[in-house]
Amino acid sequence: MPRLATYLPSTKKLVILPELLLFFTLTLLLAMQVQAQESGSKQIGGVITATNNGVSIIPSFTLGRPALLFDLSLSGERFSFDPMLRFGMDGKPWSFVFWGRYKAIKDKPFTLTVGAHPAFIFAERIVKVNGQEKTMFVSQRFLAMEVAPMYKFSNRLSMGLYYLRGHGFNPIPPDNSNFLALNTVFSNIPVGGDFNLRVNPQLFYLKVDDTSGTYITSNFSVSKPGFPIGFQALVNQKIKSTIPGDDFIWNVGIQYLFSNTFQKK
């Protein structure tokens, strides 16, 4: 039987997986199971985006070509399951991220959300199979946690921090990543025809293993309440960094938005 020895994680690699990340993931998965058994209002929705350039959760990383993005959500009062599925336009998977999130503080000007996810990043690699090099479609596996405090000053202005800690358990790097961002959100800005603009500028610091960098990015989205079509754009500029990647990244996309609320008894 062929062996993909090049891409099998070692036992040692699995043992040193940070206990905190594992704890977060198991706790949130258990909480989601509890939520599924509870009655109350649930909401299912999402955004499907077709873009000229797939951009990752960390905007300094991209697919580098057109992509189709599925951001889905099943949420209750406090818990939500938010899968993010990314594909190239050729139908090949790029990344699958399965978020579990908990709203620790809600319904107040100050909110706090924590979350965790397993993630799978797909790519074509040259690997050795029975001593011969072959090009195969393989996945890298990651586990991550997030903490997101936010303060809402008004219906149009919010500010907060976002921290993402990731760990890979693969035979190749990256092994550890830390992402810390200062967020500002300007929302409900009228742009005509009942359409509203949302702008999310972000200054962030990223550390990946022994490399690090500082960047500034901004997301723009235009949508209309009750209308399923929206538009988005992103720009990301490297300020100073030793992390490999483009100095400037941008994309534009068209979105399909949907949402439905139902009562579980």
For each predicted feature, which ranges?
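Outer membrane beta-barrel transmembrane domains
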Residues: P118, F122, D194-Q237, T242-P244, ...
